[in-house]
């Protein structure tokens, strides 16, 4: 049960089909339980690692019962559970099992030291925005989805360019011939949007970025919009066009379909260790100033 800001029930979520993840998850569960917290597991995680002795819950049950969810895996795992728990405002702690992640910012080697401190109430909290999107065909909505990183309209690998008509708040912006168009949150600005030459948006910036994918005209540049913008993207030309949400769910599109995107009413709380720095994450992930000293890290 959730009681104010006090943590009582902790949910554990692990990346699926990952060798070597069972042992650290089981060790983390036992250490948290020893501290007096109730520990529950996301159901698929519990089945995959074969753990017994802890309740196995659906994401909806976790949202209703847990005070915080700890995710051990990569950014993709965090994105998936974040979308599912968004309606419940369950805070997330991200532990990276592998390379440094943008949103799973705690190294697995540090989790035993940092998690008890954070569960005791010593953490930094921030809210991350999401997008909600729907596909409209012949005037009727046929599909709805949330996206933590981005909504991407693109062509299949062997078809030609697509032509897209983009409008913002009911006002025509442009027709664009390209391989596709990315609509990204600030969190998603360091994902596919970044590889398509989009700008990095700080997670606390209230914005949405539109980034063309390999546009035919070099004048089609990325643009940052206010986060209350209502974006409509219509399929004007091309074939084998798809839309995906965080690269985790995909839907085929037809000519004249429209994808409507806006900021979701939901946000996802992220919990970070005291001293967390977004700029340190950027520097390490993007290999900026790789020879920085420890003093530089502390100053950031």
From Swiss-Prot:
It is an enzyme of class 2 (transferase). It holds the Pfam family NAD_kinase. The active site is at residue 75. It is found in: Cytoplasm. Keywords: ATP-binding, Cytoplasm, Kinase, NAD, NADP, Nucleotide-binding, Transferase. One of its GO terms (cellular component) is cytoplasm. It catalyses: NAD(+) + ATP = ADP + NADP(+) + H(+). One of its GO terms (molecular function) is NAD+ kinase activity. Its cofactor is a divalent metal cation. GO terms for biological process: NAD metabolic process; NADP biosynthetic process. Its EC number is 2.7.1.23. NAD(+) binds at residues 75-76, 149-150, 177, 179, 190-195, 214, 248. Involved in the regulation of the intracellular balance of NAD and NADP, and is a key enzyme in the biosynthesis of NADP. Catalyzes specifically the phosphorylation on 2'-hydroxyl of the adenosine moiety of NAD to yield NADP. Belongs to the NAD kinase family. NCBIfam families: PRK02155.1. This is NAD kinase.
């Amino acid at each position: 049960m959730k009681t104010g800001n006090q943590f009582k029930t902790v949910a554990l979520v692990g990346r699926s089909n990952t060798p070597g993840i069972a042992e650290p998850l089981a060790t983390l569960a036992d250490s948290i339980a020893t501290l007096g917290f109730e520990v529950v597991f996301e159901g698929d995680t519990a089945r995959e690692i074969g753990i017994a002795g802890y309740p196995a819950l659906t994401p909806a049950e976790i949202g209703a019962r847990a005070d915080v969810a700890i995710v051990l895996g990569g950014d993709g795992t965090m994105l998936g559970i974040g979308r599912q728990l968004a309606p419940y405002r369950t805070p997330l702690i991200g532990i990276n099992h592998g390379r440094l992640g943008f949103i799973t910012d705690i190294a697995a080697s540090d989790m035993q030291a940092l998690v008890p401190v954070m569960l005791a109430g010593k953490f930094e909290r921030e809210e991350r925005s999401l997008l909600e999107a729907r596909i409209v065909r012949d005037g009727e909505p046929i599909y709805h989805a949330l996206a933590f990183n981005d909504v991407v309209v693109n062509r299949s690998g062997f078809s030609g360019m697509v032509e897209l008509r983009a409008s913002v708040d009911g006002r025509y912006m442009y027709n664009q011939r390209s391989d596709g168009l990315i609509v990204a949150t600030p969190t998603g600005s360091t994902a596919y949007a970044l590889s398509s030459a989009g700008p990095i948006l700080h997670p606390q910036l209230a914005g949405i970025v539109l980034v063309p994918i390999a546009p035919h005209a070099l004048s089609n540049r990325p643009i940052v919009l206010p986060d209350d913008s209502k974006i409509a993207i219509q399929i004007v030309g091309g074939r084998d066009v798809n839309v995906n949400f965080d690269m985790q769910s995909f839907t085929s599109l037809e000519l004249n379909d429209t994808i409507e995107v806006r900021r979701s009413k939901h946000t996802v709380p992220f919990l970070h260790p005291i001293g967390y720095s977004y700029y340190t994450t950027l520097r390490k992930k993007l290999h900026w100033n790789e020879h920085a000293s420890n003093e530089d890290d502390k100053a950031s």
